[in-house]
């Protein structure tokens, strides 16, 4: 069930990853205000894709002929949203070469998610125990990343920084598309 939903999740994650992360790492001229605009754009994109994945869940379940896929996809839609919301702060840490901190955040998140998953599995939650913990843990991770990087949402997106990184991010996105379809 999770593997079936994972196939569609990979496609939506491909659309979510338009090369902004590597562009944030590569472009050293981006200011804090630029990062806030890029982060807000990426978050809105994640919201649109997450909602689209959520409402596509019944059709995905019908396509696979497995009604359990619906709930799994709906829970995974949170991962799409949070992946986009956390992308810029996470890549700022990569840009700053704070690998130890990235590892600590990742290990703590995975440990907590693993403990939740094991507990859910022991309580008979089935395939939900594989997907719900990562959705749950992504929310506090967002707050930790925001606190550390000081990235925040802005009401008005400045399109100039997005235009500056576009030439790099579009080729990164195209490379990801080629890689995705060569593997699938």
Question: Which residues does each predicted region cover?
Answer:
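Membrane-interface junctions at transmembrane-helix termini in multi-pass inner-membrane proteins
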Residues: 23-32, 82-105, 128, 149, ...
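Membrane-water interface segments that mark the loop-to-transmembrane alpha-helix transition
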Residues: 4-58, 71-77, 100-101, 106
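Primarily residues marking transmembrane-helix entry/exit sites
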Residues: 34-35, 69, 127, 161-169
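Interhelical loop/hinge segments that connect adjacent transmembrane helices in multipass membrane
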Residues: 100, 143-184
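Interfacial helix-capping/hinge residues at the ends of transmembrane alpha-helices
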Residues: 21-22, 57, 90-94, 117, ...
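Alpha-helical transmembrane segments of multi-pass membrane proteins
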Residues: 11-15, 51, 55, 66-92, ...
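Membrane-water interface at transmembrane helix exits
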Residues: 25, 57, 61-62, 94, ...
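Membrane-interface helix-loop junctions in multi-pass transport and translocation proteins
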Residues: 1-3, 58, 62, 70, ...
């Amino acid at each position: 069930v999770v593997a079936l939903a994972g196939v569609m999740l990979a496609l939506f994650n491909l659309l979510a990853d338009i090369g902004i992360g590597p562009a944030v790492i590569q472009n050293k001229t981006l200011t804090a205000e630029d990062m806030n605009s890029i982060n807000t754009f990426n978050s809105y994109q994640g919201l649109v894709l997450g909602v689209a994945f959520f409402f596509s869940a019944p059709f995905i379940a019908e396509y696979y002929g497995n009604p359990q896929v619906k709930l799994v996809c709906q829970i995974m839609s949170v991962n799409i949203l949070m992946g986009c919301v956390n992308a810029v702060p996470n890549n700022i840490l990569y840009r700053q070469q704070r690998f130890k901190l990235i590892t600590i955040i990742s290990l703590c998140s995975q440990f907590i998610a693993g403990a939740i998953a094991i507990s859910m599995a022991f309580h008979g939650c089935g395939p939900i125990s594989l997907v719900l913990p990562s959705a749950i843990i992504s929310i506090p991770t967002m707050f930790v990343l925001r606190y550390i990087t000081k990235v925040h949402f802005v009401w008005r997106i400045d399109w100039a920084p997005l235009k500056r990184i576009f030439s790099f991010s579009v080729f990164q996105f195209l490379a990801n598309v080629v890689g995705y379809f060569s593997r699938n």
